[in-house]
């Protein structure tokens, strides 16, 4: 089989399963409205959970940062790309979340890959929730360590895996809020069983940070858990992009020596770090509390309105509200019907989610209004 035949066969298989991914160019993709092809849609696909991507204070901070520092960092943080603004952001994140240190990364995917690649050796074991994000499972699969997956949020299964002999160290990996189902991990129980077996816990809280808990401190703070490694990302609740790893001082020093994604990547622009500082200030403020309260009210309204639809509603109290349809083609058809009626919704299909669980992944944000939720419910009931 030639290269072209191999590529064609893979694409043909995706088409046959109604699983071929495609991108839609949009004029505006975050916030309350999505604009595409000169048409405005209510946007129920964005991860901009607090509606901060268009916040004037954060926009001004980025603009001022660009004027002061330029539009690029100029290099890796190990060479010339680590600015006083990066340092200030790391210190503010560490203080906010109760850690000694924070290290910035260009994306959550890079952060997860870097940590697992740097920490895990051949004699070690990773125990990962089977529904963990692709960045975690891919990194674990590519690492030299043994990978064992435990049933979703099943602490008993996790305990059995950790109890089996392991010559090295054990790392338990999970998410705070799961990206495709919107449900939360039982972090306190997971941490307890992890500690019983002398393991470390790594939590990716991409979808919880900024959005839940006191001052938006996220899933771990809410559940009174402090994992050895906490990954937070800035493309969701913060409304920007990038990520950080929270850890002890010695682990931070270790990652600065051995995390290749950090060492060999150009740092995020200082202007971006300046915008993230402004976003963090909003998240921690009374305005942040008000946005979280508004989002919670929207979620309550939505869940009350979809109970009688002929779909499976995931057990989620988060901004991620999936309606599980099952069939790929049915999910695509529903998403298209909703778009035709002014609601931009994305169909998520295997392999992103397990086979037979194609869904409409609906996301609500503090930028929405109650009438937006009512319109979404009206359209869903008309096509249910």
UniProtKB/Swiss-Prot annotation:
Chemical reaction(s) catalysed: 6-carboxyhexanoyl-[ACP] + L-alanine + H(+) = (8S)-8-amino-7-oxononanoate + holo-[ACP] + CO2
N6-(pyridoxal phosphate)lysine PTM sites in chain numbering: 236
Regulation: Competitively inhibited by D-alanine, 8-amino-7-hydroxy-8-phosphonononanoic acid and 2-amino-3-hydroxy-2-methylnonadioic acid.
E.C. no: 2.3.1.47
Ligand binding (pyridoxal 5'-phosphate): 108-109, 179, 207, 233
Keywords: Biotin biosynthesis, Pyridoxal phosphate, Transferase
Function of the protein: Catalyzes the decarboxylative condensation of pimeloyl-[acyl-carrier protein] and L-alanine to produce 8-amino-7-oxononanoate (AON), [acyl-carrier protein], and carbon dioxide. Can also use pimeloyl-CoA instead of pimeloyl-ACP as substrate, but it is believed that pimeloyl-ACP rather than pimeloyl-CoA is the physiological substrate of BioF.
Subunit structure and binding partners: Homodimer.
Family: Belongs to the class-II pyridoxal-phosphate-dependent aminotransferase family. BioF subfamily.
InterPro entries given in the database record: Aminotrans_II_pyridoxalP_BS, Aminotransferase_I/II_large, AON_synthase_class-II, AONS_Archaea/Proteobacteria, AONS_Proteobacteria, PyrdxlP-dep_Trfase, PyrdxlP-dep_Trfase_major, PyrdxlP-dep_Trfase_small
Pathway: Cofactor biosynthesis; biotin biosynthesis
Cofactors: pyridoxal 5'-phosphate
Name of the featured protein: 8-amino-7-oxononanoate synthase
Residues annotated to bind substrate: 21, 133, 352
Keyword Transferase attributed: yes
Pfam families in alphabetical order: Aminotran_1_2
UniProt GO MF annotations: 8-amino-7-oxononanoate synthase activity; protein homodimerization activity; pyridoxal phosphate binding
Single GO biological process annotation from the record: biotin biosynthetic process
Annotated Gene3D superfamilies: Aspartate Aminotransferase, domain 1, Type I PLP-dependent aspartate aminotransferase-like (Major domain)
PANTHER family assigned to the protein according to its UniProt record, in alphabetical order: 8-AMINO-7-OXONONANOATE SYNTHASE (PTHR13693:SF100), CLASS II AMINOTRANSFERASE/8-AMINO-7-OXONONANOATE SYNTHASE (PTHR13693)
């Amino acid at each position: 089989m030639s290269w072209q035949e191999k590529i064609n066969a893979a694409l043909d298989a995706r088409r046959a399963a109604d699983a071929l991914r495609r991108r839609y160019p949009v004029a505006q993709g975050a916030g309350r409205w999505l604009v595409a092809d000169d048409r405005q849609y209510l946007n129920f696909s964005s991860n901009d959970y607090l509606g901060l991507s268009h916040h004037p204070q954060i926009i001004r901070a980025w603009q001022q940062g660009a004027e002061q520092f330029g539009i690029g960092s100029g290099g890796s943080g190990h060479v010339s790309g680590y600015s006083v603004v990066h340092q200030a952001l790391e210190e503010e994140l560490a203080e906010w979340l109760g850690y000694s240190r924070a290290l910035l990364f260009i994306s959550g995917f890079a952060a997860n890959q870097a940590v697992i690649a740097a920490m895990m050796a051949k004699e070690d074991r990773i125990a990962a929730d089977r529904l963990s994000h692709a960045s975690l499972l891919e990194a674990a699969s590519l690492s030299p360590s043994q990978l064992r997956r435990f049933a979703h949020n099943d602490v008993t299964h996790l305990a059995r895996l950790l109890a089996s002999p392991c010559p090295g160290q054990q790392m338990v990996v999970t998410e705070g809020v799961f990206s495709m189902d919107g449900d939360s991990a039982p972090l306190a129980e997971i941490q307890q069983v992890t500690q019983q077996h002398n393991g470390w816990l790594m939590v990716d809280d991409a979808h919880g940070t900024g959005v839940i808990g006191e001052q938006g401190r996220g899933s771990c703070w809410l559940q009174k858990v402090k994992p050895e490694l906490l990954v937070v990302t800035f493309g969701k609740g913060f409304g920007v992009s990038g990520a950080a790893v929270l850890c002890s001082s010695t682990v931070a020093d270790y990652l600065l020596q051995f995390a290749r994604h950090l060492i060999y990547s150009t740092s995020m622009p200082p202007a971006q770090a300046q915008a993230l500082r402004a976003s963090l200030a909003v998240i921690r403020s009374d305005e942040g509390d008000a946005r979280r309260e508004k989002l919670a009210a929207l979620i309550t309204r939505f869940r009350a309105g979809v109970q009688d639809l002929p779909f499976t509603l995931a057990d989620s109290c988060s901004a991620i509200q999936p309606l599980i349809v099952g069939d790929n083609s049915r999910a695509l058809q529903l998403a298209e019907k909703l778009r035709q009626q002014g609601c931009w919704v994305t169909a998520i299909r295997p392999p992103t989610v397990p086979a037979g669980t194609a869904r409409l992944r609906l996301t609500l944000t503090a930028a929405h209004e109650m009438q937006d939720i009512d319109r979404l419910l009206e359209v869903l009931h008309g096509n249910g």
